[in-house]
Design a protein with these regions (language model features):
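Phosphate-backbone binding interfaces of nucleic-acid-interacting proteins
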Residues: 1-158
Length: 158
């Protein structure tokens, strides 16, 4: 997985153009090739607005991220959700990210899900990510939803 550090800004990417290489954010200089991406079909079942609006989507800042002992998949996130108390969320994304590359990032979480114990640790929410499969391959890609670091911890998404 490529680093998302600020130090990569201004470097020339594989296409030879300067831009915010490896930041995960679109800039006019970034050329993205989606020709080898297979997207799952949209759900046909609809969710009424009242049900959807019960989900509390918040910007969260990654204070710490470590692998969960005895798990190959889980990462344990310590997050600032703007409440003044740390929030712990576990996510099965270790195959796609190394913990240290996520510290300091701003992510999106659903914060009002009931707590769930995994590997002896209580997870209090869910981090949002996008997942797709490469065309003509069984290889799956996962991209954690990262947003602008100027968004404060606890900001509500509408």
């Amino acid at each position: 997985m490529k680093s998302l550090d600020k130090k990569d800004e201004g470097k020339k990417g594989e296409d030879g153009e300067a831009g915010n290489a490896n930041t995960g954010f679109f800039t006019p200089n970034n050329k993205i090739d989606f020709s080898n991406v297979k997207i799952e079909p949209l759900f046909e079942e609809t969710v009424d607005f009242e049900t959807f609006s019960k989900s509390d989507f918040r910007a969260v800042k990654v204070k710490d991220c470590v692998p969960v002992p005895k798990s190959k998949k889980l990462l344990q996130f310590t997050l600032d959700d703007g409440s003044g108390s740390d929030r712990t969320i576990l996510s099965g994304i270790h195959a796609y990210y190394e913990p240290e590359e996520l510290i300091g990032k701003t992510l999106i979480a659903i914060t009002n899900l009931p707590p769930r114990a995994m590997m002896g640790v209580e997870s209090c929410g869910m981090l949002l990510s996008a997942i797709n499969q490469k065309k003509d391959s069984d290889e799956e890609e996962l991209h954690l939803l990262m947003v602008d670091n100027h968004i404060p911890a606890g900001a509500k998404l509408y």
